[in-house]
């Protein structure tokens, strides 16, 4: 099935096939979700079969809204599809734009609506193995340190979020130095 995502072509937002958007480096819409339990964040390691950044650690989940889909609805959908997570309230935290080479001649040039959701630490997680290799809870401070020490283990977008947008995503109480 071809997945059509909202992308800008010659200044106009229109449906574009997802792989084509990455091959051409088109600016396109995306969502990212961070599920938090206190100061811990749920992160995922991307499945080995993903067509870009396989095996790298990323935020809880991220994807592209389908053409015509609202970002908030997309965030809830992908929590369910990727991780089997339901019933959380996702709250819009920020909109971020970035551009990053993700290997294999592909570029992510995303306008990302970022959502945060609070969860209990015993939240049931049931990852789809086609999407997610593994998950883990990690303290936000420890995650920021890990990303600085071993950036090659993490997706470009997670590195960008933590380096450039911590306060805007997590608020003043969760800013890590």
UniProtKB/Swiss-Prot annotation:
Protein name: Isopentenyl-diphosphate Delta-isomerase
Cofactor requirement: Mg(2+); Mn(2+)
Gene Ontology molecular function: isopentenyl-diphosphate delta-isomerase activity; metal ion binding
Highest taxon, organism lineage: Bacteria
Sites where the protein binds Mn(2+): 22, 28, 64, 108, 110
Gene name in the database record: idi
Biological process according to GO: chlorophyll biosynthetic process; dimethylallyl diphosphate biosynthetic process; isopentenyl diphosphate biosynthetic process; photosynthesis
Origin organism lineage: Bacteria, Pseudomonadati, Pseudomonadota, Alphaproteobacteria, Rhodobacterales
Class of this enzyme: isomerase
GO CC, any one term: cytoplasm
